[in-house]
Amino acid sequence: MSTGTVVQVIGAVVDVEFPHDAVPQVYDALEIKSEGLVLEVQQQLGGGVVRTIAMGSSDGLRRGLEVVNSGSPITVPVGEKTLGRIMNVLGQPVDEAGPIGEEDRYVIHREAPSYEDQSNTTELLETGIKVIDLVCPFAKGGKVGLFGGAGVGKTVNMMELINNIAKAHSGLSVFAGVGERTREGNDFYYEMEDSGVLDKVAMVYGQMNEPPGNRLRVALTGLTMAEKFRDEGKDVLFFVDNIYRYTLAGTEVSALLGRMPSAVGYQPTLAEEMGVLQERITSTKTGSITSVQAVYVPADDLTDPSPATTFAHLDATVVLSRNIASLGIYPAVDPLDSTSRQLDPQVVGQEHYDVANGVQTVLQRYKELKDIIAILGMDELSDEDKTTVFRARKIEKYLSQPFFVAEVFTGSPGKYVSLKDTIRGFKGILDGEFDHLPEQAFYMVGSIDEAVEKANKK
């Protein structure tokens, strides 16, 4: 437990001088007791001076303050006691419900499981959301990314997934709010409370008003808690909203530390930082971590280095499209852009694969015909193409679905559609069983039976 003194403060960057024989290691946690502030060592500058990043506000810091070295990286509470609680990056409770009372603490910087410890699974995880279950099915213990620009529904989709999976799966969940709005964190808490699954969720928040060091580490805090449950042999759901803010915090820290920026101003260590986090989110022979990550796409550009780096780590990608949202189709998932490694006849079965493929083929053909329709009109199309267009429009409408978490806004009750019903519905549309129904009957319904019922009412 060596002590040092603050020698320089520039925003969130604090330089601390220690005796030459007691210099802290990189990633060690230091504490300024008088301010209750934790610093994390990032660089050793030589001459006994270390450069640190503050985990909280550095307002009011001054040179000469005493700093104590804890001798280890940041540790956070893990285990059963974290469930139903909201914590910050340091694992301190922020829900005014008293101390956590944890029995164990883990350091947030840990090694990823070794190659031989990892397990491979192809078991499907049903979400109850038609478009996801059909074209980009999730695997239990897999990694899923929800990609989308601002305001296309990443958080609402994630809330619905939590609502559907946490209820049906009845396992444990860890939610890491990385650089998102405080209001969303608040909404999430009450949503979980109303659903009665609060006692199965641990929440870790580092909102967008927090300093960059805090936002950079909060994902690791949440992941550490999820790893503990996994190592106890449980199946955990790990939600991150939003992984882009993690990258952004890394960019800010990198700039503060004076590193030369790389493409588009991102940190030169972008791929490595993303890898450090993503490699730890994995399933072992003891338990599984199924992770769902929201990924903000700057200016709707999927080739931006941040989303492009994230793509490489995922098993399934759910791409949300502004064009689809503008048609009033929610969830605004693009069935042609979204992908999944699970969409393989050997995993999902031949029927599911053929139906998903058929849906994508029809929608792709419709996309190609749109230009012809815009110039020459529908009358110039062959009968076969006309049928394709009518079916594609029905499929587009049928891909929409009322959500449980959006009942307040839409006024229509949420619907959970089983995979069997999803395949049956789309197969019927492709086979022409519902050619006689008006396309509006397919909009915002659950199963295909509801669409038929809606059409008959009219």
UniProtKB/Swiss-Prot annotation:
It is an enzyme of class 7 (translocase). It is found in: Cell inner membrane. It holds the Pfam family ATP-synt_ab. It catalyses: ATP + H2O + 4 H(+)(in) = ADP + phosphate + 5 H(+)(out). The keyword Chloroplast does not apply. GO terms for molecular function: ATP binding; ATP hydrolysis activity; proton-transporting ATP synthase activity, rotational mechanism. Coiled coil: none annotated. Its EC number is 7.1.2.2. One of its GO terms (cellular component) is proton-transporting ATP synthase complex. It is a peripheral membrane protein. ATP binds at residues 148-155. The keyword Transport applies. Keywords: ATP synthesis, ATP-binding, Cell inner membrane, Cell membrane, CF(1), Hydrogen ion transport, Ion transport, Membrane, Nucleotide-binding, Translocase, Transport. Its main location: membrane. Belongs to the ATPase alpha/beta chains family. HAMAP family: ATP_synth_beta_bact (MF_01347). PANTHER family: ATP SYNTHASE, ATP SYNTHASE SUBUNIT BETA, MITOCHONDRIAL. F-type ATPases have 2 components, CF(1) - the catalytic core - and CF(0) - the membrane proton channel. CF(1) has five subunits: alpha(3), beta(3), gamma(1), delta(1), epsilon(1). CF(0) has three main subunits: a(1), b(2) and c(9-12). The alpha and beta chains form an alternating ring which encloses part of the gamma chain. CF(1) is attached to CF(0) by a central stalk formed by the gamma and epsilon chains, while a peripheral stalk is formed by the delta and b chains. This is ATP synthase subunit beta. It comes from Shewanella piezotolerans (strain WP3 / JCM 13877). The gene is atpD.
